[in-house]
Amino acid sequence: MNSLQNHLLIAMPSLQDTFFERSVIYLCEHDEKGAMGLMINRPIGIDVNELLKQMELDEEPDPITSLGSAVLIGGPVNQERGFVLHTPQTNWNNSQSLTDEIMLTTSRDVLTSLGTDAAPENFIVTLGYAGWSKDQLEQELAENTWLSIPATKELLFDIGFNDRWQQATESLGFDIWQLSNQSGHA
């Protein structure tokens, strides 16, 4: 099995009228047991400032610091749980280094650092995650539900969330609308 950890899943155009329509998912984990990822292009409708207030973590907001970044829906599973995908920064209770350029933290202390000098340079805050059981993702890939590309720091952090699906599809080097959603064997 080839792991797709640190890859982006790009929803095929045929995946319409579903939760994952035009979604881009960063795969944090992918092994023989299944896969776990975070959708990186679907805003929930609140920004990080509002989330911190709701969690009562924002006691004295810094008016100079803009935490207007949108909180994103990470996926349909466990939507009350937060995940912060970010550039390397240590000293938090529950962080996992995914690559040399990307970490995942699930502890509240990373949220309290946002807007301070201790915050990571780049971050994405999501609620919930997308999960696949053993062989489920492989089946969906075989059914042409998803395409995958290696993740880049630029696609994760530099491209606006509304443009990530389009930018990811353009990075494929061909017109995704020309692909068939039918799978088959020759």
Curated annotation (Swiss-Prot):
InterPro entries: AlgH-like (IPR003774). It comes from the Bacteria. Pfam families: DUF179 (PF02622). One of its GO terms (cellular component) is cytosol. SUPFAM superfamilies: VC0467-like. Belongs to the UPF0301 (AlgH) family. This is UPF0301 protein Swoo_1337.
